[in-house]
Amino acid sequence: MNIEQIFKKPLKRNINGVVKAEQTDDASAYIELDEYVITRELENHLRHFFESYVPATGPERIRMENKIGVWVSGFFGSGKSHFIKILSYLLSNRKVTHNGTERNAYSFFEEKIKDALFLADINKAVHYPTEVILFNIDSRANVDDKEDAILKVFLKVFNERIGYCADFPHIAHLERELDKRGQYETFKAAFADINGSRWEDERDAYYFISDDMAQALSQATQQSLEASRQWVEQLDKNFPLDINNFCQWVKEWLDDNGKNILFMVDEVGQFIGKNTQMMLKLQTITENLGVICGGRAWVIVTSQADINAAIGGMSSRDGQDFSKIQGRFSTRLQLSSSNTSEVIQKRLLVKTDEAKAALAKVWQEKGDILRNQLAFDTTTTTALRPFTSEEEFVDNYPFVPWHYQILQKVFESIRTKGAAGKQLAMGERSQLEAFQTAAQQISAQGLDSLVPFWRFYAAIESFLEPAVSRTITQACQNGILDEFDGNLLKTLFLIRYVETLKSTLDNLVTLSIDRIDADKVELRRRVEKSLNTLERLMLIARVEDKYVFLTNEEKEIENEIRNVDVDFSAINKKLASIIFDDILKSRKYRYPANKQDFDISRFLNGHPLDGAVLNDLVVKILTPKDPTYSFYNSDATCRPYTSEGDGCILIRLPEEGRTWSDIDLVVQTEKFLKDNAGQRPEQATLLSEKARENSNREKLLRVQLESLLAEADVWAIGERLPKKSSTPSNIVDEACRYVIENTFGKLKMLRPFNGDISREIHALLTVENDTELDLGNLEESNPDAMREVETWISMNIEYNKPVYLRDILNHFARRPYGWPEDEVKLLVARLACKGKFSFSQQNNNVERKQAWELFNNSRRHSELRLHKVRRHDEAQVRKAAQTMADIAQQPFNEREEPALVEHIRQVFEEWKQELNVFRAKAEGGNNPGKNEIESGLRLLNAILNEKEDFALIEKVSSLKDELLDFSEDREDLVDFYRKQFATWQKLGAALNGSFKSNRSALEKDAAAVKALGELESIWQMPEPYKHLNRITLLIEQVQNVNHQLVEQHRQHALERIDARIEESRQRLLEAHATSELQNSVLLPMQKARKRAEVSQSIPEILAEQQETKALQMDADKKINLWIDELRKKQEAQLRAANEAKRAAESEQTYVVVEKPVIQPVPKKTHLVNVASEMRNATGGEVLETTEQVEKALDTLRTTLLAAIKAGDRIRLQ
């Protein structure tokens, strides 16, 4: 039995894989109905549709204006067109004849659907009178109609179905109008008589038969020939085409015929695309049909699920508009290809009973072999399973279950990547053809055969873009490739863009199996040979562990890449980046015994990567890319090489052809992409893909190099090292450890600190009191190492070489020490605490506490300089202590230099603070001791500014005499500013206060003059300290005289002031002044009196007295103004009374006119400046003659009498 004989239906029968909406002949319809497979998914969709549609059928049907739209969507090949075509057959209950037997569509579904209730719903729907119009909108539309295309197509197919003219809607409208009037048949008969042909045969050429039309129209309508001719001529102009009219015409037809009507429109989504106006037209047609026809006219459309993928170029707004249109369709069915295998099994792979038995036997004998043969590497694929049971094997043979999954991905990827035209679908219809074609190719083979994956290529070859198919055809015909090579190339093309299946060697072997018991080892060898051939011919490329089919354009790019010229330095740089940066990573080695980090100098193929200065550890890696690689291939050459100078580590990587060719390709590709960046916009996608491939190739190269490093031979300082690890970083670490332990002789001199070393350093440097330190413990903890560090620092300082912390750390980190940086810092800190060394930064001394920040900041290690500390012997310290005791008049018992210096600093700091307080007081006026204070501060600062203990004691000794003199001056300053300063301030206040202002009066008293003179003498003394005790008595003597004089002048002044105030008060009362006027006059005079009451200055008291006199004159002026106002008011009152009296007398009426009460107005005060009047009369200040005297007196008399006559009183000035 061969494969062709195992199928129930003929394998080579015609299966219409691509369904066309308008291919409805009986033969095609019968096959479609008979072979239509109702999968679980399709049954659910049918249920959903009929749940929506059935209520609109039957006598009790309900109105469904808003639910008459059905939107069927799915990807290419998901069966949308097939679904609505079968639905059209079913709803119209299409009758088909086959081999003389007639069947209706419903009868086919009785066999396919087992649910009786569901069948009853279908039966109800299909037996309701229904007109079904199925059409592909793209094939029926006229591109010139633009936005009206949707409406015109709907009208066209509707007119065509009911017998009217399809191509010319205005002709159809004429027919509709005649039909309404009952004149259509008469018109057709008249036309046949006149023209000799049937109307239906000639109407599409109505322009040529317009006269015959007019005559027939005249006869049918009984109107004149002229009127009929005009009607014909105006048909297209008077045609009222809009959506509302169309829906009304559909309603009229439904009313006349008592049917439902279904417009079933295929591929409407692609047709309207992103045309917003077409979207709105479809929406309006659907809505209006529902409302106007009362749910009897339905619109069922199909569309791509991903419309943007189908037409491209849709914006987000277009997508939103498209979604809104779909929302107007209440019933939405989304078809998928999830049941592709079920369709193919039922339509193509159903077996005969005999075949089932034979295949069952095959499974029983070779089931385990099949499972192993057809399994993929799970690390490189998603879940692609082989056969799992006998039933599955029988149902799918000669195919494997994963054929469905992979082929669907193949169709999808080829179409989306542009390798095929849009007619290639990715659902069951194209897969059905592919599976049939593949099975036919092995139809003559026995039941031990399987379908290798390349067999599917023939089914899609005709759909491919010519450039793609030509590449494969030419390669297979070039005479270099054999048949197997060509078939493998086809396989690689098919899975080129399938992401779920990596095209690795093992997976390609599985895809190439064509027999159940094929020798997989031999097949692998054959596949690998073909891959090498295809790669050499640049038909494919290897990317990581995958093999990738190359298009012509990709081959051109690949050829350009392989011809890119790259020099050795570029390759070496890339190798160094991968080996040292990506794999080994660290540039340091941490020695585990003391946690010390050692810098590594790195070399690759003889080229240094870290500059010319060598570190203590040197690692040299040699690869086959080095021209000297073959020379260093044995102990005889490698041992002496690694022993030269301070020695090094040599790592020699083994030869492995693929790795070293891959590094060339990586660098070539990088250079090619860099050189062509932005230069080839038409190849941007390909170049981007090349960049991605190269990135993946580099990742694989990293893995390969890591493996080679693990296998490499290692030599170190003249010895070949045994392999103790398989990890590259561990191999290098072991070699570094070997070098350190065999070349760092003083490494073990240092005993590592147990504990938090950073905290210990901080504690040592920031301790407040050195007495808290256990100096003995500092020495015992690491004596040899401390001695080594101290010796090296001291030796360099003796040679006048500046020593910085960075120098110390660098020296003891290198061979032969290798000491950790923190351990060396701890040793330096201990030496500083022992007083061996001090610190400075930029020529400024740095206290230990401040040094911690520099210790803790590696960037500032080169700023911290060390100095050897000088010390006095015990006798010198004792002498310095005695000197300080004499100076400070207090005991200094310290015998250690640091303690003595601390005591000196404490005393002098206190003196300095004291002097600063005295200076602040002295600066406030005429205070003694300013020079002594300033000289004392200069002296103390000169001592305190010495940062070294040794220098400070030397300074105290050299300034001993000055300090003793200052000590005596300080006693006077302390006594004055602490005890006598208040008395001195009192003296200053007296001399510069009342004594100064009243001096002229005081000088009239002899005792006061004498005391005042003595006080002023003391005030001017530079050192008045001995006379300070007399100040209080002398002040009291002057104060007593001053008080008597002040009170005498005060009494006299107050009497004068009071008299003036009282006089002004009386004048205000007489003038009946307001309170405001009284305040303005009296208040300033009263304030002057208060000032006179409290003032201790005689001139001030006399000034207040004179001020009161001036204020009295101002008061007179204000009162005079007030009197003038009073007089004006009284005169006005008198005038008013007199006018009233005269008016009464003139009118001879008896009216009593009251005289106003006139209060007496006081006299104004006239100010007369006697001296001024006399000067004006005589013209001078001096009177020399009797005549001048008489003239002056006459003038004064005239002025005074004039004032009296005016009723004023006179105040003389």
Swiss-Prot record:
DNA repair in keyword set: no
Gene null: resulting phenotype: No methylation of 5'-GGTAAG-3' in chromosomal DNA, BREX no longer confers phage resistance.
Stretch forming the signal peptide: none
GO BP term (any one): defense response to virus
Coiled coil: none
Keyword Transport: no
Record's note on what induces expression: Transcribed at slowly increasing levels as cells progress from lag to exponential to stationary phase.
Record keywords, A-Z: Antiviral defense
Function: BREX systems (bacteriophage exclusion) provide immunity against bacteriophage. Part of a type 1 BREX system which protects against dsDNA phage. This system allows phage adsorption but prevents phage DNA replication, without degradation of the phage DNA. Methylation of bacterial DNA by PglX guides self/non-self discrimination.
PANTHER family documented for this protein: APOLIPOPROTEIN (PTHR18976), LIPID-BINDING PROTEIN (PTHR18976:SF34)
Family the entry assigns: Belongs to the BrxC family.
Protein name as annotated: Probable ATP-binding protein BrxC
Organism: Escherichia coli O9:H4 (strain HS)
